Amino acid sequence: MQQTLSYSSSSPSPSPMPMPSASAAQTPPPNPNLTPNLNIRPSTNPIPRPRSTGGESAFQPAIIPVDYSYRTHTTRSILSAQSMAPSTFASNQSFVRQPSESDAQPYSSLFGDPVPPPLQPDDYFGTAAFETLRNGSVELPSSEEDALVAAMALNALIPAARERIFPSVPYSRTPRGSLLPYLQPPDIQILPNSSGGSSSEQLGSPNYRLLAPDDILNKPDVYDLENEVEEYTVVGQRMSFDDEEDEPTRTPSQAPAKLSVSSITTEDHRGLLSDSYSGRDWFRPAPQHFPEFTRIPRLRPSSKMIMSMKQDEGPLSPLATMIQDMNSSSSGGEERVAPNQSRPVSRDVVLSPKQYLEEQLGLERGSQRQSLEDYRMPPPPADPPPFRRTDLTEQDDSRSVEPEHSLKREMSPVIIRDSIPMGGDYRVEQPRPHKKTAFTILSTGQAASSAPRPPQQAPTRGRHASIQSTSTTTSSPAGRPQISPRRRSIFGSEPRLPELPSALGYTSHLVHQTTDDSPRPSVQFNMSGRHSRSKLAIPQKGILQQRDSLTSSIDTFTPRAQIRRGSIGRDPIRSLPYGQKIKSMETLPLINDQHRSSIPRLHYGSTMDLSRPEPAVFPPGALPRPLKPNLNPTRRQRGLLKIINKEESLTHNPPRSNWCSLDDLSRPSFDGTPNQARRRSSSTSPERRSSTQTVSDRRSSNLSSVTATTSDFSFRRPTLSTLPAAQTLSRMRRKSVQALSPNRIPNRIPSFGQRRQSIYQRDQEPKPLSRHGKIAKPSTLSPIIGTPNKDSSSAQSPNHRSSLMADAVDTPSEVSTRRDSVSRIPVRKSPDSRSSSPPKDFGIPASGRSSRASITRSPSRTMNAGSRSPSRSMHPSRTSSRESGRPGDSRSASRGPPSRPGSRLDQIGSRMDRPNSRLERSSSRAERSSSRADRPSSRFDVSNSRGNSRANSRLSINSSSLRSSSISPATMARNRSMRATTPSRRKSISLSPASAMMGRRKSISPDAVGQNRRVSSRGKPEPPEILSRRNSRSRIPTRSTKVASKSPPSSSKKRSKSPEKPKAMGSTPKSNKVGKGVTAKGSPKAKPKIAASAKPKTKTESLMKPPVKNANKTPVNGRPTTNAKKPASKAISTKDAKVEKGKETGKSVASKSNGKETESSVKSSKSQVTKTKPPGGTTSEAKKPATTKTHGITLEKGTNGTDPVGGIPPLAAQVGNAVLQAVEAVPAVTSEVTVPSTPGGKGAGGANMSKLVRMSSRMSLLSNKSTKVRSDSPQNRKVATVQEHATEKEETVGASSQPMSNDAAAILEKSQKTLENIQKTVTEATDEIHKTISENLTDLKSLENDLAADPSPTPSSGTTMARPGESASRTGTADGSIAPQSSGELPKSPFPPTQPIEASVSVLHPNESSAERIASVPEVECESSDLPTALDASESELVGNVMPTPESGADFKVDAKRRSPDGQGGSTAGSGGLAKSSSQEFLEDKDNVKKGGLCGCCSKLFMPCRRSRCSRCCRRRERNESAEDQPVLWSGNSSATTATNVQVIDETKPKRKKISDWLKSSCCRSCRKKPAIEEHEAHQEEVSKRTNQAANMSTGPRTRGKCGLCLSKVFCCRSVNRVDPTTGDETEMKQCCFCIPCRRGSRPNKKGSTVSWRDQDPELGIKPTESSVVEGASEAAMSAATDAGNDQVKEGCCKRFWLMLLCCRKRKRRESNARRQSIRAPPPSEDTRKKLHVDLVEYSSKMKGAIPVLPLYLAWFCAFCNVVFPGLGTLLSGLFCLCVGIPRFSQFDSARARIGSFIINIIVAVSQFFCVLFCFVGWGWSIWWGTIMLRCAKKLSKIKKVERLELEEEQRQAQLAEAGKNGVAEADKT
């Protein structure tokens, strides 16, 4: 406020002071008289003044233009005779300042009366922020802004005034021209002062008060009528300053005095003002008094006190005055402002902040009448304000008379006195409580002025554009300063402003000075608010200034001012010549109501408009505000955050939008619709724009918490807005949500149904609330609290919520940003009443609205399209899941960041699935409350998948913004649409555990977002595109759980899934995956097999009884949302549910219903599973369909044309029963089984079941491992699936399961037999594996816990997670995000951690139907065509889903890998350790092969397309022993850790390999010749290594396939462990299609020593044995490297080159293995990669580093070539480097380094050759290069020699030691 005052006083002083200097003694006494005379003069003096101000003309424009812009325009029309006189003009300038000060009040009256009666503005100002602001004083912020706007508008309206605004600069003749600019800068300074100190209040009030703070406020009559009227009439812009300066001067001699002032000219004024009040001083030229103003900001604490610079104080420097006034009661000054405002709103300041205040008071006094006259364009303001204005002028004149000793000085002091009253009174209701509102207090006073403002408002509006435009012009502000600055000039007690004569030269200079002064004082006072362009751009005291900028945007939104402008000056503004400045004013007036931004902008605009009288006057704060105008408004902004929001609207339609926004804030009834629209549409942009520009400044300016708040809002809102920016709907929604946020406390529940309405309602509420809340000013703590705190407290606390809620309502961007959390919370809370605690979601907000609340709630809403109660119910779930408090279900809700897609999905699934988890409970409640299984299911699916992927992956702001968008009701609708899409995405995720994890990770988060939006839609279908995209990802996890639950949502999901899934699974459920189904026998199971890949429904059939509805989501997932979606759902369910999961769904669900390894009967388990699947929120629905799933799904699938249900249910029954029986903990098996069907669809319940399934899978694998669990493992890693539990499951399945039952019975018998055989093998393997597991389980658990994934107690959980259906857990494991799900699983099936058997079991004789079925089930691709039985079909379906999952999961190369490492060992809690078992090792190989039927390459290539099958290699593999591969994979996936990897290898069907004969034909002989035994041995070695070294286990498979990457998969190179069912012997069978990619000799075994890719790969040119390469390598390592090198040599450079080109490097595989092993504590492994000796490494230059280390002979050759032919040797060295040489970039060789070296050498060689043309430089260069090569080669040879010697020495020592040991031993023996 002090700033504002100082600016005001400084601004007025220049023009008043200069003019009065001649008549300083004369004018002051007459000032009081002149004030009455001014009332009379309006007709007499005004004309003479301009005319007689010939000499003063130069003077006048400087002063009058700014102030006169406001008053002179109107006054000109009214007092054309008066103001026309040059002397009168001079007097007017003096008086203009004073009346300007009082003008603010009259002006408020002026605007208030003419346009919308002052009551509206009063309501507006008093209502929200301005009630607080106007408590003590005339509240310049509203009036001031309105005055600025109105002045601009009136100036525009009044042609004469306009002429004076622009002609007014010339009006002053030569002196005035200069004076005008000069006065304008002071005025601007004053305005910035107001804006800086008290943007809204003190802006206007200081403008007027600064002119004559004491005089105008205390003696309004002196300055008001005569001076201001004359001023406006005669002076024009200059009149503003003249009013302040000359009004005292006029008091002694009105016309003569003014003439004298005019005669005084700029120089005279300077002389008069030169004292302490010289115009410049008053202006506070940056060089001179800027320091003082800088000090003034130091006085900022007192700035809340009105710096009433009394006339005596006036002579003091602005700083001294400010200090004095600060210390003195600013309230008194403000009170003066009120009287001054009551006095005529001197047309000097032409409705500048001062005039604005004067106008406001003008309603109370004659000054206001004159102010109205000034704004006579709008009739209402014209007459009343002039009289009141006259009164104000008289009072001001009286005050001015007091300082008459130095007219300029007196005027400035008077102005100072009147203007400075920014303190106490204004501070009453300052909007930024955190700060001592020196200027905010003015805003408080503005409440009163807000009443008169309606007339001003229209003019302000009118001027709004002009103000902005004017503000934009920095030069014009010079003329403007007189507008509102003149009174605020008080701060510049020294009549710097009065130094008008210098304004001629100083006009622009002063503008800058003002700007400079303003910035610093503005920090402290509103001075910054009036800061000039530079101030705006670079607030020097950044806090207030920056804040002003924020507030400027906010202030711009002053709806009330805007209204007035619209009524009065809007048209004039547009017609104003200073249209550019109107823009600034546009911003300013909009804000003027609430944030006193109008004044700050006016001040700045005045500075800007000094060249243009009116533009300067009107936009003093306008342009500054656009840039960084209202620091003080920023302060108010705290209280008036919604102004900030409205500021956004202002951007589009600044005056109206601003007014509307503020109006909405203050008065709900005002322009409600525009408020909403603008707020939403532009709430973010203007505020952000302004705040963004001033963000650093605002932040840097820590003056007020508003700054922090504003900047935080700016940043946050922009951040959130940016996130939602991409999503306009989201942004709108966010705004709606924001509305909810404000409404949250008052309207939250009411607005639950209507976000957007709620916003508007809230807006309306906050308006009254603002009145009540008094702008919810942040307390002094606000700065400490910070913007967010203030914002949130404002939003939530009653008062703060009133104003800030309105603010938030108005500022969606700010709310979206900073309040996004709050808004989101309200959204959740409101829509989802369950999650009613905002704090709970507050941590989530960034991701919150859309992440937790929105996702969980949204899914609930989506599911409960009709019932929001479930949504709310879901909300707690969502919240819980976000918090990830629940191990299993909480994951979905918690959306733990660790593994976004999988882990989140799994977490969601597990949390939602786990009834104990709050998420599940809340979900269950949501389900129950909604009692719509479909909706809860869909919601859960969306919530789980989306919550997991999105909450976890998008806990960040981005994710939250996306979610946030999704959260709004519209988003909820969108989420529903998304549901349709999710199934396919879910399918994709469901593919293979590893690939599913990858896919989820990749796609779930987007899908999650989509689902979030869809959930946000709350049943309102949002754009299906977004939904399908987002939903598909997140949906997969959720769907499994909620397939049955969400029949209708599933329909949507099915639709979307159907399209998406077909990509991975093939659009046609049955025939899409023909390749996969090719092997399928004609039997129904064969069909399901086809469906397995192309027909998710088959899987759904067997796995998901409910999915029957949802053919797609047959799996326990709520996927089968609708039978209508069956077709799409089939493919989707296959993917998502994955037949495995479908089969296991019942069990999994059962176990899920238990929530843990429930050991309830299969039936109860099944029904519970059905219930449990939906537990997230689909529980009630899921329960119904769950049972239906078992029965109806299978049947439905048969109906759908998927495999006959009979085939699948037996599989499901077998799997379920076998798993249940095999695993003592049926729930665990069930969980495992369910997970597969949950893979994509069962995000919530499925994820939980995943945990259970994994645990049960491990347990069941322990017991059922030898049972055809592995065969069944394709069914979902439920290795023991085929066990007795199958019978139970059949029972549970009931009728629908019976078709499968028959098969299941046979399969069960066979499987039991096989199980016995397998169990033997498994027992052995289990013992071994248990050891490994025991060793690694602890590490795995600890790692999983560390990974934030709740590791299931047993690796089986990991296996379950690894399932495609369990993509969530799988994903979580790989990413570490699965860990939460694992954790959830841990509680579910905790006891099989060590139980899980990782033994890779391949059934060699799948002749038995059970074995066949098992094999076929693993082979989703129909590789197990041997098992065309129902079980086979069901398994095929299951695997088909799995296969599609790998297809979709094909992207997830990690899918298989994760299955085995993540899914098996890594993914599951104990999976890491278990993964190390031979089974896991096998799985790794299989993973690479992609059991899903997609090779890793195909997965990568086609996963995005969701291609159901992989290319030739995959098809071949399908025909080949995919059953072997996939069963293992599935075992690894479903129960990799727990269950033995069981492969049913039909030895009678070894011809499958023959299918790949064509590929094999291309294999190299060595590869073809390689006996499987050798490979098996190598594999066994690797297996043993893995078993012993859990960390190295994943590496083992890599070594086996050196490429271990795309090539091995592309060419289907994979090794399968064949297990003889009778003997249990395991044989590694290598299926190699292409020798080069495979390269799988026994070398992998040697990998230990030659770990580096180049050691193993022929790519590395140098053999690992080279001592130079193998630095520090052990002898064994060296020998191993040598062996590997020999192998490499055999392969040859060409092969290496191709391998390199094919990117078939182990490094990738190592990375994947690292991911797998990431779960386990990685054992400290030495880097066995070959190292180049440090001495040979070239670190300094890449170019030199490209010179390879070559063998000495090659180096000599290259050097010779370089000498003979420059560059040739370099080129050859590059070529040699590819095969032989070693690049010296680093110690470690790599293909990239070699290629890089080759490229660099080519470049260098060419350069060397061509450089020979230039002075033979290239020759020397070439020779130098050859020398370096020789040197390196020699060094290498030396190193090799030394190493050889060392090696020999070591060997000798070892021999000696051995001999010594032997001798000792012999001695001991003897």
From Swiss-Prot:
Start and end residues of each stretch annotated as Disordered: 1-63, 90-117, 238-266, 323-410, 444-535, 606-709, 724-1208, 1261-1301, 1336-1480, 1643-1663
Composition bias, Pro residues: 616-627
Other comments on record: Was named stumble because of the walking impairment phenotype.
Function: Required for locomotion and mechanical sensing in proprioceptive neurons by transducing dendrite stretching into cellular responses. Required for transduction of mechanical stimuli in a specific subpopulation of proprioceptive neurons that sense joint angles. Probably does not constitute the mechanically activated channel and may rather serve as an accessory module required for the proper localization or function of the transduction channels.
Skewed-composition ranges (Polar residues): 90-108, 250-265, 651-660, 789-802, 848-866, 978-993, 1034-1044, 1111-1124, 1187-1202, 1368-1384
Bias-annotated ranges (Basic and acidic residues): 386-410, 686-700, 880-889, 911-938, 1133-1146, 1450-1461
Effect of gene knockout: Impaired walking characterized by walking uncoordination and reduced climbing speed. Type I neurons are apparently unaffected. Abolition of responses to stretching: although the dendritic stretching is not significantly affected, the Ca(2+) responses to both acute and obtuse joint angles are abolished in the mutant. Axons and cell bodies are indistinguishable from controls, while the sensory dendrite exhibit abnormalities: in some of the stum-expressing neurons the tip of the dendrite is overgrown and extended into the distal segment of the joint.
Gene that specifies this protein: stum
The protein, known as: Protein stum
Transmembrane regions listed in the UniProt entry: 1745-1765, 1766-1786, 1798-1818
UniProt biased composition (Gly residues): 1463-1473
Entry membrane topology: Multi-pass membrane protein
Tissue: Expressed in limited populations of proprioceptive neurons that sense a mechanical property of specific joints. In the legs, localizes to 3 labeled neurons: one at the femur-tibia joint, the second at the tibia-tarsus joint, and the third spanning the second tarsal segment. Dendrites of stum-expressing neurons in legs are stretched by both flexion and extension of corresponding joints.
Comp. bias regions, Low complexity: 1-12, 867-879, 890-904, 943-968, 1080-1095, 1161-1173
Pfam families, per database record: Spec3 (PF15795)
Family: Belongs to the SPEC3 family. Stum subfamily.
Subcellular locations according to the entry: Cell projection, Dendrite; Membrane
Keyword annotations of the record: Cell projection, Membrane, Transmembrane, Transmembrane helix
GO CC annotations on file: dendrite; membrane; sensory dendrite
